[in-house]
Amino acid sequence: MTNKYTDHLLVLPEDDANRRLVNGFLKNVDVKYRCVQVLHEAGGWHNVLAAMQAAEVVNGLVNHPKRHLLLLIDFDQQAATRLQEYANRLAVLPVAAQNRLYLLGSLETPERLRTACGMHLEDIGHQLASDCPPLPAGSLWSHPHLQHNAPELARLVTQVQPFLFQV
């Protein structure tokens, strides 16, 4: 459980595979894991996007300006469509909430990413944490299954790097 009055990141994973990526991310020694709370799996990308519009989530973001929410989904080879749906849903939220909501995910599924990288999901998450600040060229984030995340990832890292990563 995080302190809602200090900077923190909530993560809403679509499924168990995405949760395992997050768990690997949190095991990286450069990550201040106490600033992160992983929520229960939403059970599908539709449920993840619906959750971002729930009154409890929106009010939590508006009332707690140090809260950030990362939505982690499978894009299932439909990145453009899902990003557009996310943008449409985001547009109707209060600006105070919009600026602290982020959407990332694998182009297909985490399992396909695992196969393409030849690594366990937790190991991929660990490597992604290592590659976050300052996003070096040739990092795992530039993999074809992840490169579509670049604009949102840059926005996320800019916002959370000061409190999420060891200096």
Show which residues each predicted segment covers.
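C-terminal accessory helical subdomains adjacent to catalytic cores in phosphodiester-
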Residues: 1-10, 19-40, 49-167
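Helix N-cap/beta->alpha junction signal
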Residues: 14-15
